[in-house]
C-alpha cells in the first residue's frame, strides 16, 4: 500500500474506531488494514494508535498526524477531481440538502449558473432546517451555515462571513441606536436559538473584549423567522451579513456597532460519512465556494 493510501486507511480507522470499520469502508480485509497501519507507524517511527479492549484511539502524535494526513488526502482528491473535471461531463442527478435561510438566500439564486455549466445534470434540492441523515436520505451534499453539531461529518469550509448587529431604521428611530455592546441589554433582541449557541455574545475592539447577555421578548429556532421579525420592526438581531444581504444593499436594514467585531459565521459543505464524495458533489461545493467569494452581497429569491 502506498503512502497516501496508508494515510487514508489511518484516517478511516480513527473515524471508525476500529480496523473492521475501516476495512468495511475500504472494501478490503481487516488484516490488510492492520498491516498498513503497522507499516505506517514503522515508516514514521511513531506510535499512532492505542489498542485496547475498548477499541482504537489515536495517541497525541496520532491526533496531530490525523489532521495533517486528512488535509493531504483531501488535497490529493481535489487534484484528481480537478484533472478529471477538465475532461469529464457531469450527468445524472445531484441531491442537495440546505437549511432554509441558506438555501433560499445563497443557493437558489446561484443554481441557474451551475445548471448552465452542466446541462446533462439534474438537481434535487431539499430545503429543510432539520439535521437529516445524508446516507439514509440519499443526499450527495449538504450545505450548512454556522457551527457543525456533528464532528464526525466529512466537511469542507466553503465560505466565511461577518456577523453584525442589524435592525431597521424604523426600529432604531423608536428605540435609539446602541453606542456600545452594553447598550444592547436595553434593547429588544430577536434571539435565534441554536443548539450550540446561546444568547451571550463576545464583542472585540482591538485588545478590548466585552461579553453581553442578550435578551428579548421573541425567541425563534428559525433564521427565516429572525429575518421576518427584524423586518417587522420587532427588534434587532445578531446575524450574518448573508442573512440580510438584499436588505443591507437596499438600506432597508442597517448594521450598528460596526467598530466592534463578532465571531464570524462559516459555511460548510458536508458529505456522507464513510464514502468518498462524488464528482458531482465536489463540483457543486467548488462552484458555491467560488460564487460566494466573488462578493459579499448575494442576490435573493423574492417571494
Write out the residue ranges for each language-model feature:
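Short helix-boundary/capping micro-motifs
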Residues: 12-27
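Residues within the DNA-recognition helix of helix-turn-helix
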Residues: 29-32, 36-39, 110
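Conserved amphipathic alpha-helical core elements
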Residues: 40-41, 253
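A short LG(V/I)-centered, amphipathic sequence patch enriched
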Residues: 41-58
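Short helix-loop hinge/linker segments at domain boundaries
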Residues: 53-56, 63, 74-97
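C-terminal effector-binding regulatory domain of bacterial HTH transcription factors
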Residues: 67, 120, 241-254, 260-303
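Central regulatory/effector-binding core of bacterial HTH transcription factors
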Residues: 91-154, 301-303
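Flexible hinge/capping segments at coil-to-helix
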Residues: 152-163, 167-190, 206
Amino acid at each position: 500500500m502506498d503512502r497516501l493510501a496508508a494515510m487514508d486507511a489511518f484516517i478511516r480507522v480513527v473515524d471508525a474506531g476500529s480496523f473492521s470499520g475501516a476495512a468495511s469502508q475500504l472494501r478490503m480485509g481487516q488484516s490488510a488494514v492492520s498491516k498498513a497501519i503497522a507499516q505506517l507507524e514503522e515508516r514514521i517511527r511513531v506510535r499512532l494508535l492505542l489498542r485496547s479492549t475498548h477499541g482504537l484511539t489515536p495517541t497525541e502524535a496520532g491526533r496531530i498526524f490525523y489532521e495533517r494526513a486528512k488535509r493531504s488526502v483531501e488535497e490529493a482528491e481535489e487534484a484528481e477531481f480537478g484533472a478529471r473535471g477538465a475532461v469529464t461531463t457531469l450527468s445524472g442527478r445531484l441531491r442537495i440538502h440546505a437549511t432554509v435561510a441558506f438555501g433560499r438566500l445563497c443557493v437558489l439564486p446561484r443554481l441557474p449558473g451551475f445548471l448552465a455549466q452542466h446541462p446533462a445534470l439534474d438537481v434535487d434540492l431539499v430545503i429543510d432546517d432539520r439535521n437529516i441523515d445524508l446516507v439514509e436520505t440519499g443526499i450527495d451534499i449538504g450545505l450548512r451555515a454556522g457551527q457543525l453539531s456533528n464532528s464526525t461529518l466529512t466537511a469542507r469550509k466553503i465560505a466565511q462571513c461577518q456577523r453584525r448587529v442589524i435592525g431597521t431604521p424604523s426600529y432604531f428611530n423608536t428605540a435609539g441606536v446602541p453606542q456600545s455592546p452594553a447598550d444592547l441589554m436595553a434593547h429588544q433582541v430577536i434571539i435565534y436559538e441554536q443548539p450550540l449557541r446561546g444568547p451571550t455574545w463576545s464583542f472585540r475592539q482591538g485588545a478590548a473584549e466585552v461579553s453581553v447577555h442578550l435578551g428579548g421578548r421573541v425567541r425563534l429556532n428559525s433564521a427565516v423567522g429572525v429575518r421576518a421579525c427584524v423586518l417587522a420592526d420587532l427588534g434587532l438581531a445578531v446575524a450574518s451579513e448573508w442573512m440580510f444581504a438584499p436588505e443591507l444593499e437596499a438600506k432597508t436594514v442597517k448594521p450598528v456597532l460596526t467598530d466592534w467585531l463578532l465571531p464570524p459565521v462559516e459555511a460548510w459543505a458536508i458529505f456522507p460519512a464513510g464514502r468518498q464524495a462524488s464528482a458531482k458533489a465536489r463540483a457543486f461545493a467548488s462552484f458555491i465556494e467560488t460564487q460566494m467569494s466573488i462578493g459579499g452581497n448575494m442576490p435573493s429569491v423574492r417571494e
